[in-house]
Amino acid sequence: MKFVIKSISKNSGRLGQLRIGKESNELQTPLLMQTTKGGSIPYLSGDVFDSVCKGQQQQQLLQLTLSTMDQMAESLVQWNRSLSEYVGLPGHATVLLLRDPCETTPAGGNDRDVVPLFTRRGKESLTATRYLELVSSFAPDVYQGLCDADTNPDSTKKRVQKSVDRTERFMEQCYERRVENSTLLAPIVGGYNTFARTQSIKHARQQPAGSYGGYILEGFHSNGLAATELKATQLLPIVEHCVQQLEEEQPRLMPGAYTPLLMLELIRQGIDIFDTSYAYCAAVNYKALSFSYKLDEIRPDDEHTPLLDMTAEEYKEQFKPLLSGCTCLACEKHTRAYHHHLYKTHELLGPILLMIHNLHHLMGFFDVIRASIGTDQLPALLEHLRMQNTSTEINYRIEPNNKIVTKAAMGKGFIAPAV
């Protein structure tokens, strides 16, 4: 993996080019990894995903997770082609992570020599040896080092220190037995403790040159919707502390469903790679992304919401697209009323269309981010996203959908509210 910085600005972050593998195209950073579940883009077939990516970078970076794919390791040993071909998305680069950023990772299960892997079949205890065997079976282009990232804003100092000490022990084996033809990402852990983060960084930086090809910053949240609830005042000082001690020539990755506003703040601090788990978390909770990311865009006063809750009764008679001017399939062919109807009738097409729209919207957002960095306008975009032309700061947190639709409550025409 080769990373080249094209431009860097104190106020707007940095632009870069990432080349993964000898025959890959150059990926422009800041970059969105495509979150997958079991190797598939959630709700989307390969053809639909290709149509969503039309007009974007030809090659995408697929984020694969061991917690949703570990059962494939045995068959992958017999596979003599690329991992992206195995999952039916040929031509794309792959990065293998340990945990699914879309789902809350249960706490506990960590021990001196093992890390818990929570799968659909239950918990498996991974030693460093077993982990490296699995990575060798998958043979991804990029993989993260084994780490104890079971920390969040509420973690105690003792739990944080244990996570750093255990990660150092795991990484000694990962550095010693690097997987051939794959790039290792060095994990930086330590919760919200600056001393622990510094210890983790020092351990990575004291390794011989070429031991790893980038950094993955973890241990800030428990994945799932918890990432959308993080406070910028708590997270940003820790990330800034870490970035100041990392080499500029190495890419920096932060997985998780961070809000668009927080992603902008992190990009401004020098983080290069994120994922699309925010789009998935919104879709699975029947939310459509609707925030404005164009500086010259002017909307009516009632159109400043960052998320449309398609479970709300107000949309049952709104015969207009999710977002005016959006060119995705969900907006060009369907109305808000239809999306609300799909929710009420439990149709699988509902989250499919929302995922199409949310991915399209988030990818367009990153196109604008890269253009804004190039013209040093990221601060203006950040302010636009924070206020959305209103007088109050916008909240991008995703609320879980706890409504239950029953036949008894709907009546004729499905007009009764959900209970």
From Swiss-Prot:
GO terms under cellular component: cytoplasm
Molecular function via GO: metal ion binding; tRNA-guanosine(34) queuine transglycosylase activity
One matching Pfam family: TGT
UniProt KW Ubl conjugation keyword: no
GO annotation terms (biological process): tRNA-guanine transglycosylation
Cofactor comment: Binds 1 zinc ion per subunit.
Entry binding sites for Zn(2+): C326, C328, C331, H357
Record's subcellular location: Cytoplasm
The keyword Cytoplasm is annotated on this UniProt entry: yes
Keywords: Cytoplasm, Metal-binding, tRNA processing, Zinc
Disulfide cysteine pairs (residue numbers): none
Cofactors required: Zn(2+)
Family in the record: Belongs to the queuine tRNA-ribosyltransferase family. QTRT2 subfamily.
Subunit relationships: Heterodimer of a catalytic subunit and an accessory subunit.
NCBIfam families: tgt_general
Biological role: Non-catalytic subunit of the queuine tRNA-ribosyltransferase (TGT) that catalyzes the base-exchange of a guanine (G) residue with queuine (Q) at position 34 (anticodon wobble position) in tRNAs with GU(N) anticodons (tRNA-Asp, -Asn, -His and -Tyr), resulting in the hypermodified nucleoside queuosine (7-(((4,5-cis-dihydroxy-2-cyclopenten-1-yl)amino)methyl)-7-deazaguanosine).
Record protein name field: Queuine tRNA-ribosyltransferase accessory subunit 2
Organism, scientific name: Drosophila grimshawi (Hawaiian fruit fly)
